[in-house]
């Protein structure tokens, strides 16, 4: 079973990935992890990628594609894999199709965990931190027991990281939506896209994912 897992930041993709790996026993291939491994192991593509990263430049598609291809050539992917964070654009999607054709494989499903942007902004911008002891809270999921007072140290001074501020979160989501929309259309046309409602409880989301994968 060969999968691609898609979802905007905050959609709960990481949690679903762990559950899929546990039940279906396929490797979770996250681009961040394979980049680090390729650079550490000094693979040909890892060496190329490091040149760009060291200069603070974006790694070109052909190098990213090469790193994914190196990983998909490893033995543990022969019975299936789950890609997470790749492809990020249509050029990478075409490259993935070519890789799979070359190795006599095909993509079985693209699972898209869908959560409305306004819900994601709420999820991602709800985090706040006690300035005194550093304990992290969330306005919706993990608030302080007494409003305005830290459970751990009793402090009253909280702050929000710049990354977690609603405007920053919204901008980050906008960038991701622009990247994801053409990919969603691409995979819809190929007939392999399955969109899952990510606004349900984690268990219900996974139930829907599992149903799709079991019936492939």
From Swiss-Prot:
**Which residues lie within the region annotated LID?**
126-164
Q: Which residues bind ATP?
A: 10-15, 127, 136-137, 200
Please cite one Gene Ontology biological process associated with this protein.
AMP salvage
- Function of this protein? Catalyzes the reversible transfer of the terminal phosphate group between ATP and AMP. Plays an important role in cellular energy homeostasis and in adenine nucleotide metabolism.
Q: Which domain of life is it from?
A: Bacteria
| Residue numbers binding Zn(2+) | 130, 133, 150, 153
An annotated Gene Ontology molecular function: zinc ion binding
Q: What is this protein called?
A: Adenylate kinase
Residues binding AMP are 31, 36, 57-59, 85-88, 92, 161, 172
| Pathway(s) served | Purine metabolism; AMP biosynthesis via salvage pathway; AMP from ADP: step 1/1
Give the PROSITE patterns listed for this entry: ADENYLATE_KINASE
**Quaternary structure annotation from Swiss-Prot or TrEMBL:** Monomer.
Q: What is known of its domains?
A: Consists of three domains, a large central CORE domain and two small peripheral domains, NMPbind and LID, which undergo movements during catalysis. The LID domain closes over the site of phosphoryl transfer upon ATP binding. Assembling and dissambling the active center during each catalytic cycle provides an effective means to prevent ATP hydrolysis. Some bacteria have evolved a zinc-coordinating structure that stabilizes the LID domain.
Q: Which family does it belong to?
A: Belongs to the adenylate kinase family.
Q: Does the keyword ATP-binding apply?
A: yes
Per UniProt, the enzyme's principal EC class comes to: transferase
Pfam families assigned: ADK, ADK_lid
The protein's Enzyme Commission number: 2.7.4.3
- Catalytic activity entry: AMP + ATP = 2 ADP
- One GO CC annotation: cytoplasm
- Which InterPro entries does the record cross-reference, listed alphabetically? Adenyl_kin_sub, Adenylat/UMP-CMP_kin, Adenylat_kinase_CS, Adenylate_kinase_lid-dom, P-loop_NTPase
